[in-house]
Amino acid sequence: MNQHLRHQPIPFIDTAAQRQRLGKSLDDAVARVLAHCQFLGGPEIIQLEAELAAYCGAKYAVSCSSGTDALLMVLMAQGIGPGDAVLCPSFTFCATGEAVALTGATPVFVDVLEDTFNIDPASLRRGIATAKRLGLKPKAVIPVDLFGQSADHDAVAAIAADEGLFVLDDAAQGFGASYKGRRIGTFGLATATSFYPAKPLGCFGDGGAILTDDAGLLERLRSVRAHGGGSDKYDNVRLGLTARLDTIQAAVLLEKLKIFDDEIAARNVVAERYTAALADVVKVPRLVDGCTSVWAQYTIRLPKGVDRDTFAAALKAQGIPTAIYYPKSMHQQTAYRIFPSADGGLPVSEQLSSDVISLPMHAYLDEATQGRIIDVVRGALA
């Protein structure tokens, strides 16, 4: 291989390639918004919400300003507050627990499964018992579809039904994935997702959405999204937020949605190549039978004895970026140590935080470039 190409940096996520592919269609979509000047609540918002709902098979979609606000809006609309407990995995991005804490409720952290990185049903049951022992009222569970693969929604739903909890699916990384033949977006009371630019379906700024089949929740969410407003603009009926998605972002998402399935297929090809080439030297993620992933990340686990920082430095020296999702689980972070964890501890979350590392993953990663990544990974572990 040419020495220059060997060290030429590889993008971790290639948004520029996607931008080039969409080209004039994106320019025209944004230009239409600039022409009609309906920057909030424009026709693209209505169209996007309809298309998101149809894509997932949900009755309703509510666009909003971020994936974090999507979680928070549902919790607020459901009246979650002080004295309540909401169960969520610790091994995830902080927004999951943050949204709970912002309502005044208590996040109770539970463990995950080591091969899928998703919520462990047994730990969930222990977490519910922990919450009750502490005098809290368990009200909800937030499973996370981490790294693009769905949680075990049947198991979560069964536990939630037994305990009288509602389920809020955190699909910030899992929009477009499927579980047992059903697309994410129809499990539980509601699904929250994110359109952050690095997500599989991302806009050109912050954005998010909520999917639900519950008409009553739909109306409350629309109210919460705009300061808790009611029929009289200046007589707010509940506490709310400023959480609208702007029309330019909706226009961008409508164009990206047109190529989304094609990009998911390409991501799966990339994931399959990684798995085939690396399964003998690292622990690769397990894709559950009957499920599909959108591969928001391709996260591997390094063998015992391999120093993660040294490994990452070896790849960086060859122009290959890596990322660590997540170096600390939520219960280990300064702001969240005060909140309880399920009895028995969270050993899997803690172990994952010490040995996971993510490789470049996007729909435009060609076979030759990926081959270079694979060769360097194997060389760094030799």
Model-derived segments and spans:
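Conserved coil-to-alpha-helix start sites within the AMP-binding
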Residues: 92-97
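Structured binding elements
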Residues: 104
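N-terminal "arm"/small-domain region of PLP-dependent enzymes with the aminotransferase-like
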Residues: 1-38, 43, 360
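PLP-dependent aminotransferase class I/II
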Residues: 2-3, 16, 45-50, 58-59, ...
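Phosphate-binding glycine-rich loop
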Residues: 37-85, 99-101, 109-111, 137, ...
